[in-house]
């Protein structure tokens, strides 16, 4: 028998609980962990994305996100195959070397769905010259998803303004929230309306209370909404220490339940139990997936304010590192966007 003969093939007959692949986390806040994604997780997630992602018979996708990342794998490869629509793939290096190529490909191949992290839209604004923008036609770009890192309101504003002459609509921005432990997508803006941006009082936000800033008050903390939970996803905001449900208009840890919840971490039962086995102390409901993200839900929409492990406490006050980083980046023209990192040190 040859290595390719039927004698060397064993049919697996996978069921929903069968392990499909290991998706390693980014390692941005801890050592990378292998997330166990099942076939059932994949099908549940694909149904969620299909329902929420505004796909139709004319949809065409394009992705330059790396395939080892859940964004590039699920949205770039699995989802187009699931819905049976054309998909174009571009190397991440192609985008990084010349961001214009991404937008040129969207025009050339009549792409309707393509997304990227916040930094990519910012790079397009910063590096694509006005004469190049004038040659683009982005009127067919229906869903410009944005996720995988904090979404800055000024990035949305600047990109929408810069590429409006090319036919890009602000309503095409679809902010999203997701994580590997939930296969990928947790929430996504649905309707063809502009993204929700709340102007919050930073003083009350430090205390974990959501309060819109009064007119004329400065500075304000602007938070971009990430849409409604997809499919059967249930979002609960819980106090990270008491493990009880937070009151309305209170910031807490985002907990999840749904068919996209993965099976845990490969060969790491202790961390699996900590992360995937949470129960609400006041009601006994569970199990929930603890995301480690801080946020709140308002009018059915998820808002992410930061990472629990990243929160900086200085003289008893809570500071979100992304706020400090953004302030530093905007303080001088020599400060490169995405080039600052705020963290605490022991005295």
Tell what function each PLM region has.
Residues 43-60, 67-112, 127-131:
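Conserved AMP-binding/adenylation subdomain of ANL enzymes
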Residues 111-115, 125-220, 234-236, 241-245:
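Gly/Ser/Thr-rich phosphate-binding loop
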